Structure formats: C-alpha cells, structure tokens
C-alpha cells in the first residue's frame, strides 16, 4: 500500500471519528477500535468497444485483407457486411452498412479486452483494423479495480436511486452485487473474482482474496471515465456504535434486509445513507479515487493510442 493511501485512510478515519462523535453519539468502545488498512487496488481498463465508419473503398480493402490474414476468422460475408474474430478469438469485429444506415449509426464495431492482448497484438489491431475506420470513438469502457480483500464484509450503496441486485454464495455471504441495469449508461458490478475464475476453470488465483469493482460505461458516459463513481460507497458500518437503539435496529435492518430501503420515503433514505457513511471507518471508494488519480495519465495514454496517432504509451 502506498504512503498516500495509508495517509488518506488514517485521515479519513480520524475525520469520521470526529464527525461521528458530534453527529451520532457513539459508545466509547468505538474510540478504541484499530484502524484496518486495505491494500490499494490494481486498476485497468477491462473492456473496450470502438465504433467508426468504413467508407466504400476501405470496406473493400479491409474485406480483402481479412479474407487472407491468418489471424482472422471471417464469416457472414456479404458485399455490405461481415463478422470476424481475430487474434485467437480475442477481438470481435462487425461491419454492417445496411443496418447502420437504417439506424443512423456508425457501421463498424470492434470489441476487445486490452489486458488479453500483447503489445504486438495491439499494434497489429490498431494498424490493420482500427485505422481503416473514420469518425471513430469509444462507445464502451470498463474500469476494473481489483482488491486483494474480502469485499463480502463490506456494505455497498449509492447516493442515487438505482436498482441493486445481490447474489449470495454457498456460505450465505454476498458474492455479486449489481448497481443499475445492463442497458444503462453506467452499470456497476462488485463480485468475487477469485470464485469466478475457479468456477470457469480459469487461471488459479494465489491470493487469499480477489474481488473486483467493475464500472461499465456506455455511450456518453465513456467521456466521464475518470469521474464516474462519486455516488458509490463501499463501507464497513458499525451499527452497534450508534447510541439510540432505534437507529441501531434500523441500520441493522437496512444492511441485512435490502428490501427495507424500498419502504422508506426519500428524506428518510437520505438520513440513513448519511448515517451509514458516518459510522464507517473506511470507504473503499476513496482508495479507488486515489488509485484512479495516480493512474489517470497512463490510462489516458491508452485511450489516445487507440483514438489518435500511432504511438505506444510508455
């Protein structure tokens, strides 16, 4: 964990203690609790979709190239459309002029996970596929924060009213949490990445825990990738620190019975959201913001590599 990360957690904990003493009136036992440090998460883009237009000349050139390139598997080929997978199925490519004209949208789409591509494969994809497109841009970016910590012990919520879905594991603990719906401009997933890899017989994870907070951004929201989760909170609230038994009971119910939120009016919801934040020593989203700030320039270079001039980031 970086020194900056330790400082922000220590400062945050102190601020919460001072705030809680004046706002909620907690018991003396709260003052004696140890501050728990969480390792800084690893951050990367996990999925990208780039769309653009192929003019008639470039569509012909690209179709000819793809029909002979050994890195590409081409199918559904017609004069005005084709589908393909490239680089051992790691890249999906689709061109459909008729559908694009009918829906008034760009006619070519390229989908891939940059983490699964080598530098050489990225260069190949940029030079041989993406550079054929005009008026290109991102319509999907996924930000992934990987924590070597057990996030099932945390309580996640948003300040906004969005649909929240929770799936539980065999041990009765939360294993996956969704905020929003898949078709929305922002869809947040918090899930046990280690368990997912185990279920899929994927690469073995050596860490004791591996959880991922994934923020899927679509359409206009991709422009706000560096400022897209200010309303999200991942907390460890201590309901027993509250003085009033009524508040303890309500907070306990809201944490353990999510459906209770739907029975409250807006003002009451806001009251208890603020109370939950005030009785938590840590909000992991502060660590996420710090990590994002430290990596922002590097991530921006990756975006610029795909969008602009041909140059690798350092």
Swiss-Prot record:
Region listing for Disordered, in residue ranges: 1-25
Domain of life: Bacteria
UniProt keywords, alphabetically: DNA replication, Plasmid
Alphabetical list of InterPro entries matching this protein: REP-like_C (IPR003491), RepD-like_N (IPR054456)
Composition-biased stretches (Basic and acidic residues): 1-18
GO aspect biological process, one term: DNA replication
Purpose: This protein is probably a specific topoisomerase involved in initiating replication. This protein is specifically required and may be rate-limiting for replication of the plasmid in vivo.
Additional detail: The nicking site of REP proteins is sequence, but not plasmid, specific.
Similarity annotation: Belongs to the plasmid replication initiation factor family.
Official protein name in the record: Replication initiation protein
Organism: Staphylococcus aureus
Gene that encodes the chain: repE
